[in-house]
Amino acid sequence: MVKQMPGNRVVLISLLQLRKSTLYPGPDSFPEYTGYGGCMEEPKLIKVVGAAIIKDGKVLCAQRGAGKSLAGYWEFPGGKIEAGETPQQALQREIEEELLCEIDIDKKVCTSDYLYDFGNVQLTTFLCHLIEGMPRLTEHECIEWVEPSQMPRLRWAPVDHDAVTRNSGMAF
């Protein structure tokens, strides 16, 4: 550390001298960090799945409804993985429940994590195709078929950003 002294003299102060000063009392003066379970609790891990459903070169995007966390944000439809389910089973179930249609799961796009104030959401997004029915609103505020290049213009839930980036550059 360099300290300017009267008369324009420069004095080097060693880190050891600084540590001994009252400005920095040293690590012994602070409570010991014990990691998760000590000072902080480990965030709840919430595993969810999302479907990037493709039809006629467009991707189905869903806007979260009022009264839900992240209301007004866009997402790929899907939901939580229940105990004993594979991600694919959870996605099939969630799409049937939320959109009243059936999908064929093609391939995994990506898995991403985002730490929200309510927990750590781990989203696995799959590329999917409609096989029966047309998506209908049951839980979302709005659903839209969007050109992949236009997807970044929507206000997406943070955990969906990686999948949006990967899908927006694709041609279906």
Residue ranges and their predicted role:
Residues E102, S112-M134, E144, P148:
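Active-site-adjacent beta-strand/loop module that shapes the phosphate/pyrophosphate-binding cleft
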Residues L127, R136-N167:
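NUDIX/MutT-family hydrolases
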Residues E41-V59, K80:
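Conserved N-terminal beta-strand and adjoining loop/helix that marks the start
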Residues K58-E97:
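Conserved Nudix-box catalytic region and its N-terminal flanking loop in Nudix hydrolases
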Residues D28-C39:
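Short, Lys/Arg-enriched N-terminal segments with co-localized hydrophobic residues
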